[in-house]
């Protein structure tokens, strides 16, 4: 009888140990599931930096900085300027058609490094200081025209500043008019329209065009909106 009691106690102990092990395992699995669920939620909450439409819809402005370590593959143009290689074919087609229409456009500024963007910002601030503004005032005004480093579309290679070979005001005006009316056909949009400065955070720049893809560019053009409004 005493021996039977011992056996029963051993069986209970073994059974209890098994129950504890199984319980711990279930808790562990549940914890991992919860961690994975939380991780997935965090990723979804953080959002896709490329937007729902892929890389060409990446939103970059003072409220949406460039993703860390973003490094596009670049193509060098004839004048040494660089652009994201994926936009080059459509950019070239747009310029070819503009030339057929009597224009002579070229990319005055394409991809910029962080250091170059900082240099441009520093120069802009210094220029306003030389006009008598305080450093704080100069910085505030400069940021209306030059995006702070880390928030410029030029740093992702999808934006181009377009000028004319003949830099007279009339010729520049003609090419910008042509671009306003036709750039969407090639996947580009006027990025900083005159009536959207309160939304984009940047002053009107008739020379600054951004690649978003042909279908989306046409949607934006037809609706008369800016990229921020499209992505809402």
Named regions from a protein language model:
Residues 2-232:
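Extracytoplasmic cell-surface/polysaccharide-interacting catalytic and binding patches
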């Amino acid at each position: 009888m005493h021996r039977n009691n011992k056996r029963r106690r051993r069986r209970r102990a073994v059974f209890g140990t098994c129950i504890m092990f199984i319980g711990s395992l279930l808790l562990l699995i549940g914890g991992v599931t919860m961690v994975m669920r939380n991780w997935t939620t965090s990723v979804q909450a953080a959002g896709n930096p490329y937007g729902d439409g892929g890389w060409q819809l990446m939103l970059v402005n003072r409220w949406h900085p460039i993703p860390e370590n973003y490094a596009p593959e670049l193509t060098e143009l004839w004048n040494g300027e660089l652009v994201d290689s994926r936009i080059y074919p459509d950019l070239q087609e747009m310029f070819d058609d503009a030339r057929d229409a009597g224009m002579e456009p070229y990319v005055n500024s394409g991809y910029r490094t962080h250091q170059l963007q900082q240099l441009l910002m520093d120069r802009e601030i210094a220029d306003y200081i030389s006009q008598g503004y305080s450093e704080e005032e100069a910085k505030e005004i400069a940021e209306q025209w030059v995006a702070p480093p880390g928030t410029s579309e030029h740093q992702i290679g999808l934006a181009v500043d377009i000028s004319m070979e003949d830099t007279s005001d009339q010729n520049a005006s003609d090419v910008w008019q042509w671009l306003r009316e036709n750039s969407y056909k090639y996947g580009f949009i006027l990025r900083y329209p005159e009536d959207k400065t309160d939304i984009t955070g940047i002053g009107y720049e008739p020379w600054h065009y951004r690649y978003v893809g042909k279908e989306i560019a046409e949607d934006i053009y037809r609706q008369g909106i800016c990229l921020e409004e499209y992505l809402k």
